[in-house]
Amino acid sequence: MPISFSSIPANWRMPLYWVELDPSKAGLGTFAGRSLLVGTMLASGTAEPDVPIAVASQAQADALFGPGSMLSGMFKAFYANNWANEVWGLPVAEPAGAAAAGTITVTTAPTAAGTIDLYIAGINVPVYVAAADTVDIVATSIVEAIEADASLPVTAAAVAGVVTVTAKFKGASSNDINITDSYYGTIGGEQLPVGLTLTYVQPTGGTGDPLFTNAISNLGETEVDYVCMPYTDSTSMLAWETEFGFSDTGRWGFIRQHYGQIFSAKRGIYSDLIAFGETRNCAQTSVLGIEVGSPTPTYQWAAAYTAKAARALLNDPARPLQTLSLDSCLPARSHYRFLLSELNGLAYGGIATQRTMTTVPVIMRESTTYTKNLYGNTDDAYELVTTLATLTKLLRNQRQAITSKFPRHKLADDGTRFGQGQAIVTPKIIKAELVAEYRIDEFNGLVENGKAFKTHLIVERDPNDPNRVNVLYPPDLVNQLRVFAVLAQFRLQYDRGLDTVIAA
C-alpha cells in the first residue's frame, strides 16, 4: 500500500468511509517568547520562594512578592516597557545578611513653605513643609511621606532631625537604592524650599546574595527566552550561565534545546565596568552598563532592558535594539554620563551600552559578555544579542518543520523507487526541505545568500548508523546597519582646475 496511513489499519474491512487527519503539512511554529524576572521577595508576599509563577499585572506582583520588594520593583519597570508579552516571576527569599541603610539629615530648617521633591530609588516622594517647621518636624514629615508609599523599597524612622532609611530586603542589591532630591532641578520646577538644607548618606551595608540551586532546579524544562537576572556577583552569574550554557546539561545543549538569553545591568565608573567585563565571557549574557549617578536601581534597569529586548526580539530577532527607549529609568545627570569614547570602549569590553541623547535613555549596542574564544583570543562570533536570538528562531523553525513533516518516516538512499504517498524520505528530500525552510527564513529577513547556503549545505546518511541523517547546516545570518560612515569630499565648484575630466 503506497500511501502511509497512521491510524486506519490495513486489515480494516468495515464499510464505508473512514478518514484520518494529518496536520504535518499545515502547521507553522508559534513561540510565546516568555520572559522571566528573578529577584528577592519579601516575607509579606504570598508566592512560594524558588517557584516560578506567571504574573499578569503589577497588582499581582505586589501581592505575590510584597509591595516594595525588589521583584515587585522589577515588574514595575518591565511593565513600563513591555505590557504585551508573557512574563513570569521567580522569587527568591532574602539571603542571609543585612539590609542597606542610609540617612537624610535635615541640616537647617526652611524659612519659607514649599515641597521637597525627594527621590528614593528613582521614585518621586513629595514632602510638603511649612515655613515654621523645625528640623524635627521636617524629618517627621519625610518619614510620613515615605511610609505612606508602600511601593518604595525602604522604611524610615526619624530621631533628632535625622531620618534613617532602611531597605525592606536584605542583600548586596539593597546597596543600589539611591536617595536624592530635586532630580529635574529648577528647570523642572524642583528645588528645596528656601532655607532648607538636606545632607544624604547613601544606603550601604547590604550584604548577601541569594542561592539559586533550588530556583534553577524548579524551572525544570520550562522554556524561558529572556531572563532578567540582576545579580552580577560571580557565583550568581556562574549558576545562571551554566544553566543556559552550551554543555550537554545546558539549555543550549543538544539534549535540552530550550535556548534563552540572560539580561542584567551593572552600575560603575568606566574602569570598574571594563574590569568587570574582563571577568565574564558568556555568549548568552548581556550586562548593561549604568552610570553611578542614576537614581534608578540597577535591578530596574535590568528589567527595563529585558522588557525592551523581549518585545523587539520576539517581533524580529535579527533587528538591532539600538535606539529603543528604557522607559521609567532615570539617567544620570549630563555631567555624570559616559563619554562617547567610553561607550565605545565598553562595547569592546563586553558591556552593553545605553545613552541619553534627549531625556530618556536608549539602548546603543546590545553587546554580550563574550569577547574571547577558548584560547583567550578575541572573538566576535557571539558579540551581539541578535546572533543567538536569530539562531534560536532558525533552529526552532527547523525543528518544527522536521518534527512535523517527518515524525514517523522511513529512510532510504537517494534514487530509491518508492511509491507516491509513502512516509519515506531520502537525503535529497530532506535537503530540499531545508532549502525551502531557508528561503522562508530569507524572505522573513533572518538570513541571506540562499545560493551559497544551498551549495554548502550537506545532508547525508551516517555511514555507521543507517537510521541516522547527518546535516551540516551553514546559515548566513543577516546583519544589522550599525555604522554609517561618510567621507564628505566637498568642492567649492566642480571643474575648478582640479576636476577637468568630469563631463558636464
Language-model segments: residues:
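Disulfide-bonded cysteine-rich modules in secreted/extracellular proteins
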Residues: 97-110
